[in-house]
Every structure is written in structure tokens, then in C-alpha cells.
Amino acid sequence: MVLTGLMKTPPLHEEVEITIFGPGYGECIVVHVGSGRWIVIDSCKHGTKTPPVALKYFDRIGVNPAVQVELVLVTHWHDDHIRGLNELLERCEVAGICISEA
């Protein structure tokens, strides 16, 4: 997945930003909730050699997911929503995880 047309810098401290990757096969939503804090909803990874799209985006805009992502939310256990989840959780060291029973 190529990240075109996206911001190259993080949102301002007081801004809320919602970025949706997909839709189609593999969706991911990245939410800046303000004050440099982030939530990631689902993981989206295309292929085996690329990182999850949220991590690519964070790298692009200079966000450190290890300390800035506070929550990873998994909506359901379909492959297109959880592929790359292990890699995402490894990089989001302080994030809590919320997993739907669906």
C-alpha cells in the first residue's frame, strides 16, 4: 500500500485526526485524540515484507508508536483486520489492547 496524499507531519497538539486506510481488503483506522496520543483500530498489512500500514504512517509523520499509541482495538478476527497485529503490538509498547468477541 502506497501512502500518497497523506500528511507528512503529525497533527497539532490540540487537533483530532482520523485517517482511514483501505477500504477493501484490509482496513485500519488511526486516530490522533490530541496531545500526541493515538489509537489504532485494526491492523492492515499487505504482503509479507511490508510493515502494517499504521506503522508506515507513523514512521512517515515522525510519531513514536512505542510511547504515543495508547490503545489498539481489534474489531474482529478476520485476516484482513488482524494481519500484522503481532508486529503492531510489538512496536506499540505501552498500548492497551481491546479485542471484540465478534
For every predicted segment, state its role.
Residues M1-H13:
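Short glycine- and acidic-rich boundary segments immediately preceding or forming the N-terminal edge
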Residues P10-P65:
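Conserved beta-strand hairpin/beta-sheet module of binuclear metal-dependent hydrolase folds
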